[in-house]
Amino acid sequence: MNFLAAAGVRRLCAMRAVLPCLWRGKYFSSGNEPAENNTVTPMLRHLIYKIKSTGPITVAEYMKEVLTNPAKGYYMNRDMLGEEGDFITSPEISQMFGELLGIWFISEWIAAGKNAAFQLVELGPGKGTLLGDILRVFSQLGSLLKNCDISLHLVEVSQKLSEIQALTLTEEKVPLERNAESPVYMKGVTKSGIPVSWYRDLQDVPKEYSFYLAHEFFDVLPVHKFQKTPHGWREVLVDIDPQVSDKLRFVLAPCATPAGAFIQNDETRDHVEVCPEAGVVIQELSQRISLTGGAALIADYGHDGTKTDTFRGFCGYRLHDVLTAPGTADLTADVDFSYLRRMSQGKVASLGPVEQQTFLRNMGIDVRLKILLDKTDDPSLRQQLLQGYNMLMNPMKMGERFNFLALVPHQRLHGRNHQTNARQSKPSPSPVAGFGELAWQ
């Protein structure tokens, strides 16, 4: 991604076309926010200084600064998940979500021949709740995994979140090892005795047989936004409003910009979002899986190359204008799963995307719900289970808005096993769990 950052967009002193509110629709206000909402945050001051120095910035650079700037970034020094945060994720809603994902990884491990060891790698683990639910399944199915050497590897840029993850997973029963200068900046041991390590970059995770999990990871990676004009594709930039010195606005670049190379030649939409960083991550995952085996499971808000503008902000569970009070709200964009598949470049087989309600139903969520309901007579617990199920499965909630995509070695789909440390070559599940009913040949 450095080549894009280096290329940048030089200061645009002329031909700045103000971008109309093309995407504001149901997501945003008209742009004429009341003065009291135009909070001059430390991040806004930083961005204004930056734009004055170098000119308008891309939406991708804007997202990156707002979310992950080491000093002022939204993710860097706060807990944005759960009741006190700005959004709740699936693992916070119901234990069934993580339990079924745990079953998925075990299913794929068995299908590949029960390798003697595997790494479970999560990208952006949130509070660690999802991993905690997965590890509980691993413990419950300990007879299957008792001779398998498992280790956890967490890719997390936020120091605040990594501390929360450590508390969730280890309860600090064993003191954590910390080394801020090392690629492995923290190490520990989970409550069940599994070693866990933290990294800032996926490339630092050992290239071994691994299962990868990316739940609501890709939707916060920076996107470049483009508008089709009579002169071709023009990138949407963020600039200072000339009428209000402490307010930002969207403008169109007067000429082509480097990120335009990521737009497909046959693109028919008038507005597109592209995420080169997502492509880099998918290429890395695909390369690793093709060389060392394993699989990747991706779950996120998304579409299959059909949507146009999805860039939006969240603050206190409410939609928030993306240019207002930067640094106080989460910024996100739906994942283009067609782009992710394309960027795997044929190195692995891809399955999906399938809607969350389909994936979870195929994984047996209805059976799991019945088991949990049968185990309790507590009305409040039963209501909590039913509400969680509804949130996960209802098409108007998460059921159709979230999608699942899997990356597996090509040989996985042909029932062949090429893992040197595998204990067996059969049975081979068909089809891959979640993308068809969980069944065995």
Swiss-Prot record:
Enzyme class: transferase
GO cellular component, one term: mitochondrion
GO biological process entries: mitochondrial respiratory chain complex I assembly; peptidyl-arginine methylation, to symmetrical-dimethyl arginine
Enzymatic reactions: L-arginyl-[protein] + 2 S-adenosyl-L-methionine = N(omega),N(omega)'-dimethyl-L-arginyl-[protein] + 2 S-adenosyl-L-homocysteine + 2 H(+)
GO MF assignments: protein-arginine omega-N symmetric methyltransferase activity
Composition bias, Polar residues: 418-427
Transit peptide: 1-46
E.C. number: 2.1.1.320
Region of interest called Disordered, as start-end residue ranges on this chain: 415-434
Principal subcellular localisation of the protein: mitochondrion
Record keywords: Methyltransferase, Mitochondrion, Transferase, Transit peptide
Localization of this protein: Mitochondrion
Protein task: Arginine methyltransferase involved in the assembly or stability of mitochondrial NADH:ubiquinone oxidoreductase complex (complex I). Acts by mediating symmetric dimethylation of 'Arg-118' of NDUFS2 after it assembles into the complex I, stabilizing the early intermediate complex.
Protein family per UniProt: Belongs to the NDUFAF7 family.
Entries under PANTHER family matching the protein: PROTEIN ARGININE METHYLTRANSFERASE NDUFAF7, MITOCHONDRIAL
Subunit structure as annotated in this protein's UniProt entry: Interacts with NDUFS2.
Descriptive protein name: Protein arginine methyltransferase NDUFAF7, mitochondrial
Lineage: Eukaryota, Metazoa, Chordata, Craniata, Vertebrata
